[in-house]
Amino acid sequence: MEEVTLVITSCGRFDLLKRTLDSFFEKNTYPIKKIIITEDSTEGKKLENLISQYENKYNFCLIINETREGKLKSIDKAYNEVDTEYIFHCEDDWEFLKEGFIEKSMKLLKEEPKLLTVGLRSKKDFKEDFFMKEEYVSKDGERFYEVNEEIYTYNPGLRRKSDHDLFGSHEKLKDKLYEMELSKFYKDRNYRTIYFKEKYVEHIGDKRHVHFSRKGKNSILDFKIDRMVKKIRYTFLKLFGKVK
């Protein structure tokens, strides 16, 4: 059986991270060799306290940034620790809804070497022109939505470590629109991305986006103030049913 590492990028939203982990553990049905979590808030103790609820059941590797370094450096640190053929990449603000997403994704990646990843979000989350008009058809006849241009995403999805290694470090993208740059890189090499027609995940981080300035100092105090304000606003919006 092919081995899979779960990589999660986190930054101080521990309530959302707990929902992400709980739903993943409930819905995932494929063995995970190791779970790597990078924490960019510098609040390692809080992460360790959360993970202590699970550590006797799963093999965790926690990477705590001593200063805020941002998503790209965090991804590089995590992927440097991966020793499996496949990576299930995730962020700290997703809820998993259905079982079988890793097995089904792996089957598709095995049958098509140029398939970059299989998306799990609903088609309704995207603009009308995000997907091609012509659908992707697998070898067993199942139909999927195929992405038009933005084929690279940090949203939840299974991917090959070898495909990541083609590009290398993501930190070199720090002054660019990184998902667009990565999409162009892989599209130029004839990669494709498809999405299931059924929804497997729900984004739960609306209104809780983590601020990281590409040019600013990104102090811990600024981060904590920004996090507090967004969490208060999110709590009120959730109370009135405006967010999930």
Question: Model features per residue range: what roles?
Answer:
Residues E85-E95:
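Short beta-strand-to-loop acidic/aromatic patch adjacent to the donor-nucleotide binding site
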Residues R19, E149-Y152, P156-S162, L166-K244:
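C-terminal catalytic/acceptor-binding lobe
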Residues E66-E81:
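Glycine-rich, basic loop-to-helix element that forms the pyrophosphate-binding segment
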Residues E99-T117:
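Conserved donor-nucleotide/metal-binding helix-loop-beta segment in metal-dependent transferases, i.e.
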Residues E3-T5, K34:
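Cell-envelope/extracellular polymer assembly enzymes that use nucleotide-activated donors
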Residues R13-N28:
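Short, well-formed alpha-helical segments that are part of the catalytic scaffolds
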Residues V118-F131:
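Short beta-strand-to-loop element that shapes/binds the nucleotide-sugar donor at the catalytic cleft/hinge
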Residues F24-I63:
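Acidic donor-binding segment of Leloir-type glycosyltransferases
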